[in-house]
Regions:
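Accessory DNA-engaging acidic/polar modules
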Residues: 1-85, 489-499, 506, 511-513
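Walker A/P-loop
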Residues: 93-115
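Conserved helicase ATPase core of P-loop NTP-dependent helicases/translocases
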Residues: 133, 147-157, 338-342, 347-351, ...
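Conserved helix/coil segment N-terminal to the catalytic DExD/H
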Residues: 152-182, 193-198
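Post-DEXD/H (motif II) to motif III coupling segment of the RecA-like Helicase ATP-binding lobe
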Residues: 190-248
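Conserved helicase/translocase motor-coupling segment
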Residues: 288-364, 370
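A short beta-strand element within the Helicase C-terminal
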Residues: 386, 393-408, 414, 434-437
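Conserved segment of the helicase C-terminal RecA-like domain
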Residues: 422-449
């Protein structure tokens, strides 16, 4: 009597032995001479099982060790319409896919809703330790009766619900692959990298949810998300959620002219760079063009001079003195609102911190000090913070109403993340969130800004400095939230989730054999 085929999990792959009759499974399998067995990538587990079942093939499933997990939230909240719509779209797509929502639009609660609608062992993967601890705190509050653990930062738990960093999940992908039925990838644009993608490829999880504000990647690998997680099933922009889930907001572009000296030097540097690019037939504007420029700059003295000229021209555009005058004016206009200032480099962060007496946050700031600064910003002790990239992602930033981008990259993701830092609705009522993007006029930064703002419709303004004022003596002012040492401008332009629904059927059970 023929033995029943057995499907087993082996370090990120599946082994099906003895080979079953029929042909439905063959397209997934590759013969492995080392073990004399057919081997299938773990990521094809769901498709393989569905193919075997549709072919009427009997088999024993020893691959999965995940199990049902009763999830009852301690507090039920009424979801926003876009959260209910996103959950419904994800369920309709077979509980696989990517949801694109802006920062502060409630992606964490949407994930909780997905967990309640798919009550199985769940792995949540996040990019940073800060985010790992934020998710852990949220889930502990939501599901106090369920064992929740951490993987990363010294923790090595194995629990029904596990929160891990991408690094730790990738390192342990071979052992995690058959333990979880639902994978949730926060900031899922990190997943397609060579190192991280094994988390999805070595997992048999039939249910997958990707969350991000900006799935697009400069290297084009965001296309791999459809294979690793599923198709994009739902998307909303900040503009579509403005005034409902997010605060009303306005994006203002302020153009600053270079000084005569800066302009002459900038034009000279750009001429040097462009002449070299023309000589070697390289066009910037794409990842491939930039990579060719970097390679060519290492091959000759002319290439090195061109690269140095490019860097100096960028420094002039990003750090022109005119931007600092604009910053002083904006700080005056918006005092005592909470303001976040973003720059492209730490040197500018520290210069602004020292000259404007503003707390600074960079990757060099110790964790304890960073938490203390953010706590003081949250309780109003600090009204303003200046930072480079450390607050773009993975840090719980207290509510702010104004963001000033003095310099940035061409990344649409970075722009949307920075905008998201001021979009959280105020607990005190309606607010108008403002994002000012200060760019140097007639420079490459102006073109970069246009790419960054491709998803928004900003107001454009040319900066006009205030009339010169008489010098004022520095004086100590009392700690009064309504008074400002600057001149202030008079006018400044729970509902329970759906009932558990086999993958897409009435019950999210793995198929029984």
């Amino acid at each position: 009597m023929a033995r029943t085929p057995t499907l087993s999990f082996d370090r990120g792959t599946l082994i099906l032995h003895p080979p079953p009759k029929g042909k439905a499974w063959i397209e997934f399998a590759t013969w492995d001479d080392r073990v004399e067995r057919f081997r299938i990538p773990a990521i094809h587990y769901r498709e393989l099982v569905e193919a075997l079942q549709s072919d009427g093939t009997a088999f024993e499933d020893q691959a999965r060790i995940f199990a049902p997990l009763p999830l009852v939230a301690s507090v039920e909240m009424q979801p926003y319409p876009h959260q209910s719509e996103a959950l419904a779209a994800w369920i309709e797509a077979g509980r696989q896919g990517v949801v694109v929502l802006p920062t502060a639009a409630g992606k964490t609660y949407l994930a909780q809703m997905a967990m309640q609608a798919t009550p199985r062992h769940t792995l949540i993967v996040v990019p940073t330790l800060d985010l790992m601890h934020q998710w852990y705190a949220h889930l502990m509050a939501a599901f106090p009766d369920v064992e929740i653990g951490l993987l990363g930062g010294g923790s090595r738990d194995r629990t029904p619900i596990l929160v891990s960093t991408y690094d730790s999940a990738a390192i342990n992908a071979e052992s995690l692959g058959n333990q979880y039925a639902l994978l949730i990838f926060d900031e899922c644009h990190h997943l397609p990298s060579d190192f991280n993608r094994v988390i999805a490829e070595f997992a048999i999880a039939p249910y997958r949810l990707g969350l991000t504000a900006t799935p697009e990647r400069a290297d084009g690998r965001h296309a791999d998300l459809e294979t690793l997680v599923g198709p994009e099933v739902y998307r909303r922009t900040p503009e579509e959620l403005s005034g409902t889930a997010l605060a009303n907001h306005e994006v203002v572009q302020i153009k600053v002219k270079l000084s005569a000296q800066e302009r002459d030097r900038y034009d000279e540097l750009i001429k040097t760079r462009n002449q070299f690019l023309q000589d070697v037939n390289i066009r910037l504007g794409s990842m491939q063009g930039w990579q060719r420029f970097v390679q060519a700059s290492a091959r000759s003295q002319a290439g090195r001079r061109a690269m140095l000229a490019h860097r100096e021209s960028k420094e002039i555009a990003l750090g022109t003195e005119g931007k600092l005058r604009v910053l002083a004016d904006l700080l005056s206009q918006h005092y005592p609102e909470r303001i976040l200032i973003f720059t492209n480099d730490n040197a500018t962060v520290y210069w602004i911190s020292q000259n404007f007496l503003i707390p600074a946050l960079t990757h060099q700031t110790p964790v304890k000090e960073r938490h203390e600064i953010l706590d003081r910003f949250r309780n109003g002790t600090y009204k303003t913070l200046v930072t480079s990239h450390v607050l773009n992602e993975g840090v719980d930033v207290p509510e702010a109403s104004v963001a000033v981008i003095l310099s940035g990259t061409g990344s649409q993701r970075e722009f949307i993340q920075r905008l998201g830092r001021v979009l959280r609705r105020s607990k005190e009522g309606e607010k108008l969130a403002m994002l000012y993007e200060v760019v140097a006029e007639q420079t490459s930064e102006e073109n970069t800004s246009d790419r960054r703002r491709s998803t928004t419709t900003p107001t454009t303004a040319k900066f006009k400095p205030k009339p010169a004022q008489q010098p004022r003596q520095l004086e100590i002012v009392p700690s009064n939230p309504t008074s400002s040492p600057y001149e202030i401008s008079a006018h400044v332009t729970h509902r329970a989730a759906d009932s558990p629904l086999q993958w897409g059927g009435d019950h999210p059970e793995a198929p029984e054999t």
